[in-house]
Amino acid sequence: MNIDAGLIHLSSVDHKMEKLINKFEKPYFVKENNYFESIVRSIIYQQLSTKSASKIYGRFNKLFENGSLNPESVIEQSNDTYRSIGLSRQKISYIFNVADAYTNGMIPQNFDKYGDEDIINTLIQIK
């Protein structure tokens, strides 16, 4: 279902939603192309306030300012480096595991070619 079809459906089944839909602009979503970065960002943001997660993610990105945020460069950093920017040991472990899964081919580079169910089944195998 695309956005337009979803908005039409919501408008037809919920009068309050119809008012909101008519009042505000249609949402715009930016499609992510760097799936590795999206997964890492999700890990960092889990169970944190938006403000805290944003600060930690900003520090994380500064480690890769030259555009080198990829599985290999993530693995090259030490646990201590990640701890120093505010990541918990558990999140560091998850991030390393995702990076390792990318480098060993467990996670395909072209996630956009896979269905939701295939992606979910792949990701739940990683701890």
What are these regions (language model features)?
Residues L20, A53-K127:
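Alpha-helical ds-nucleic-acid-binding substructure associated with the helix-hairpin-helix region
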Residues M1-K31:
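Intrinsically disordered, low-complexity, charged terminal extensions of DNA damage-control enzymes
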Residues F29-E37, G86-R89:
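Structural motif
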